[in-house]
A protein has these predicted regions:
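Core catalytic alpha/beta fold that binds nucleotide/phospho-ligands
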Residues: 1-108
Length: 108
């Protein structure tokens, strides 16, 4: 259950490998499994080119507005665990990935 002092946060979710939309939907589902994180709003899906490797597959992305009672470092660890569950491997910088979750903003 979220504590009364929950902080607003914005997460960017993206995928450029496999079934991109399904990867993002699974990541959203896994985020909601943590009782200390709640999704408030979700953007529409949008595409972006891979950077800096424009020849890599495009990214499908969303932005999530959420509330969390997790501290910033705990939130970071939590989203990295989700990336790993979805098959993300650190092969080289800016490599294509099944799931990428970035903390865009954390209300302190």
């Amino acid at each position: 259950m979220l504590e009364k002092l929950a902080k607003k946060t914005y997460l960017g979710l993206g995928s450029n490998l496999g079934n991109k939309k399904k990867n993002i939907e699974i990541a959203k589902f896994l985020l909601q499994q943590n009782s200390k994180f709640r999704i408030l709003k979700t953007s529409s899906f949008y595409k972006t080119k891979s950077y800096p490797n424009y020849k890599d597959p495009f990214f499908l992305n969303i932005v999530i507005e959420g509330e969390t009672s997790l501290k910033p470092l705990d939130l970071f660890v939590f989203v990295k665990e989700i990336e790993l569950k979805l098959g993300r491997k650190k092969t080289f910088k800016n490599a294509p990935r099944e799931c990428d979750i970035d903390i865009l903003d954390y209300d302190q």
